[in-house]
């Protein structure tokens, strides 16, 4: 169950694997270092084991976040997915912004207040990324030259709101505008375009590299 493409950095991934091996050696009472290495016959097998471990961890976090959303009556407004790298919260653009605007609605602030508490509880030791996305309909605005600028401004608005209203460390938060480059639905229909207009917040697994 996940969205997006999992892309690994070769060097950092190998460092993670080395740490994984070291931890396994320190924590095993009855196994030698060579025994730990012999469990895997290649770097690819080690990488697969690490990814599987991260996937299980992120699945547990995603389930916990989903339960928190249900308790806060946000399950219909915020969807949750996960990969081996991160747990993702996705919100429709219409929930947060008026058409062509980067100013948060009052309703959006109420939702982000609750999402912020969840991020404080489960993402305070992680890198958190905020991404803005649009459909592929060209924007005609004196404020924004294109959808790329609009999506960037929307991600920044969410970033500023969270840094002002939560205890999250701003240095742990990232923001980016993706324009219409990463659609999750068919832009040829209104329903698809509505799904593509969104903001995603990702809580990265501490053992992965942002």
Task: State the predicted function of each range.
Residues 74-82, 126-129, 171-174:
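Short beta-strand elements
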Residues 61, 90, 96-123, 133-210:
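Periplasmic OmpA-like peptidoglycan-binding domain that tethers envelope proteins to the cell wall
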Residues 1-86, 92:
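Juxtamembrane linker/hinge segments adjacent to a transmembrane helix in small membrane proteins
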């Amino acid at each position: 169950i996940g969205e997006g493409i999992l892309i690994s950095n070769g060097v950092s991934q190998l460092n993670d694997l080395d740490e994984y091996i070291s931890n396994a050696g320190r924590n095993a009472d009855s196994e030698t270092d060579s025994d730990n290495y012999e469990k895997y016959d290649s770097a690819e097998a080690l990488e697969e084991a690490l990814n599987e471990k991260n996937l299980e961890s992120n699945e547990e976090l995603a389930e916990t976040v989903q339960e928190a959303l249900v308790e806060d009556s946000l399950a219909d407004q915020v969807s949750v997915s996960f990969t081996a790298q991160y747990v993702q919260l996705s919100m429709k653009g219409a929930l947060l912004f008026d058409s062509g605007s980067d100013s948060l609605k009052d309703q959006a602030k109420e939702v982000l207040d609750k999402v912020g508490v969840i991020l404080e509880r489960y993402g305070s030791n992680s890198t958190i990324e905020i991404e803005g996305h649009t459909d592929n309909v060209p924007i005609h605005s004196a404020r924004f030259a294109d959808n790329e600028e609009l999506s960037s401004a929307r991600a920044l608005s969410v970033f500023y709101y969270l840094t002002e209203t939560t205890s999250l460390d701003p240095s742990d938060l990232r923001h980016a505008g993706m324009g219409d480059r990463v659609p999750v639905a068919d832009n040829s229909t209104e329903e698809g375009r509505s799904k593509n207009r969104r903001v995603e917040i990702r809580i990265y697994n501490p053992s992965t590299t942002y």
